[in-house]
């Protein structure tokens, strides 16, 4: 197959998945070229050494608020302007792709709007690997964005109350436009592939569209056991961002009696500075040794996973989560909250422990059970690596992906021949 790829991904799990998918397709003899905007991360696991990579301009200008009316509609105009700029970028990419005789478009997510608009403009069979819908629109994090403002204390017709109402009305209209555009872009693809059955349900809830599960793989050559001694350390892995629920991990470690309390090391590809400050203050107040490490190399990551006694996984409704499987390949068991896609990767008692809810005391007891029983932790870790190698290898994942792409080409041919 001749495959055109489009993405607008930051560093992290999504880009890691795309890299291995492109690598696997090339190794299976397919011809692949990639398109992306300049804001996509091209330094982390770059595609350039694997395939021809085309960087197509994307530009928009944040409008300055001028006057009282301008201040009210600024956020709306910025959202619409950014959508139109991304649409124009996708149109230019599509013109290049349409002229090159590709068999299929394989798109990935957009870091700004999650669903790419490129499917609207490419005249090819088209498949998107959608890591998740725009969760800010559909989930309470911590509050649904659509909820009405609190009832005013005074008169509903007071100028200040009317001003708040109008500003909120404009804000919500911008959200509605984002949701409309996301759904229309999703409907333009012949197939939506997702990383878990949980994600399939999320797509169905958000868009009312069917999606198919194409499980990802994990690189067992990178993530491996080094045979190092295990320290009394709990490790967490993921961006230092509110969605990762790191405050729960700190509370869980704090629930372990202080004489036996392990340290908590958190490794992230980036950190939200204000959130990290809050975490450090929380850890200090709870007497938890908390160490954050940001942007470390894969070698350092693998060593850290090998030295930890256990991984704690507290992400909120994570669609899939590569981190637990990466830890498992390093023979590190995982304690995770039983929500989101992690229920499809962690088998309770086989490669870790699933905790039924976000209760820090329950999570802490599960962590202590592994930290205080090194022999059992080793047994879980050995089982974990064997299970990941058997079920979560990249060759099986690429074979599934290849089948879905070929199926879409065949379906499109059948439609064209009617």
Language-model segment annotations:
Residues 362, 369, 376-391, 397-403:
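A short, well-ordered alpha-helix in the C-terminal region of glycosyltransferases
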